[in-house]
Amino acid sequence: MKKCWFHSMLSNVELEYRCRLSKSMDNLGPLENTSVSEDPILNDTEKNTYNWSHSDSSNVDHLVGVRDIRNLNVDDTFLVLGRDNKKDGYSIYFDIENQVFGIDNNHSFLSKLEKEFSSYWNSSYLNKGSRSDDSHYDYSMYDNKYSWNNYINSCIDSYLRSQIGIASSILSGSESYSESYISTYILGESRNSSETGNSRLRTSTNGSDFALRENSNDLGVTQKYKHLWVQCEICYGLNYKKFFKSKMNICEQCGYHLKMSSSDRIELSIDPGTWDPMDEEMFSLDPIDFHSEEEPYKDRIDSYQKKTGLTEAIQTGIGQLNGIPVAIGVMDFQFMGGSMGSVVGEKITRLIEYATNQFLPLILVCASGGARMQEGSLSLMQMAKISSALYDYQSNKKLVYVSILTSPTTGGVTASFGMLGDIIIAEPNAYIAFAGKRVIEQTLNKTVPEGSQAAEFLFHKGLFDPIVPRNLLKGVLSELFQLHAFFPLNHNLSRTLT
């Protein structure tokens, strides 16, 4: 059985994760560090680490950092060492093979941690066992090794997120401390022990970032807090919903661009008071009488209309972008996955024809899972129809079409107007593909490399032009249009002429 240490240290400068070889748990020695000075308090804590009563755990083969923790297997024994903002030392011991868990140096932080653990020990589907009389608990009661391993993983996840939250509060000030505390509390409360998944934890502190792949329980925010917080799907950080829209749906913790509704995107891009929608009353009538054993197509359309307040998966219209008149269409992934049916294709085609006649620059914001299967070949025809209208707009009229690819952009949208822009812009970390990862793997029986369908990877393959963050997008579009001789309206001049 291999024994490992996982070490975490908080300083007032940054959250560090270090690794070093060590022979004895009682004599770790100072840790090498090239970025900040050594912490004598931490070193003293390490040297005086509690000697666990289990004789087979007194020697440690090596010390591992966060980057190496994903290499631990289920038979590893490891200890989590840390120090909170009061510089109190504490350690958490896991022996997965012998199913032992313990906490040393109990204080307020650990009491909260133990309280969280106790809910697992007392859960109805696990058999209770005896506790030792030692200062730490000896839980050797699990007849379900799979359940034990999953829970150990969730404990590590909870610990890492709490440490990162404390570090963020130290770096950004006392105001965010309460927010990170609430974030840790809600994330812990929202843990669902009945489901497991594959999650990615990512953070950045003073330019130092790391990634952790792990199996953990579902960490979705519970319905209880959903009206207050928006949880990032990448780092699981919580963003205050009241300010999330003003932040352009960008996670404050890791900078990930979360999905936006079409209405929010229009508000972000178009000048206030200039938006004039087109074809709002157009909706699908189930042209092929699509048969579904679950929910009829018409009923499904009605439910999405009530849910989103939209009639279809795209909004089209005319507006001004920093004073420049533009024709813009914005797809909405919340409406049936942004799928392209006959109505979506017709609205886009009419928008392109209007922009052609009025000599307006064109913007199409893509967010779609592809062609809508409920409309069969009629949805596939939209690809050719839109491409034909774009040919007249671009080749004959020599006008400028900007395609903006957001996450996700897949299927028939990628294969048609998504990739036909004179300038193709992608959002950071956008998922862009023709066939999705699951479809490729099930069809070809081959594994799709991680990240091979992400915007950053595809950018280096020359698939599109720039990757532009949302907070810079409006300015970039304005400069591009002016470069192509589309200038803001001069309102003073127009008043004089009239």
Swiss-Prot record:
Binds 1 zinc ion per subunit. The keyword Cell membrane does not apply. One of its GO terms (cellular component) is acetyl-CoA carboxylase complex. It is found in: Plastid, Chloroplast stroma. A zinc finger (C4-type) spans 232-254. GO terms for biological process: fatty acid biosynthetic process; malonyl-CoA biosynthetic process. Pfam families: Carboxyl_trans. Coiled coil: none annotated. Its main location: plastid. It is an enzyme of class 2 (transferase). Its EC number is 2.1.3.15. PANTHER family: ACETYL-COENZYME A CARBOXYLASE CARBOXYL TRANSFERASE SUBUNIT BETA, CHLOROPLASTIC (PTHR42995:SF5). Belongs to the AccD/PCCB family. This is Acetyl-coenzyme A carboxylase carboxyl transferase subunit beta, chloroplastic. The gene is accD.
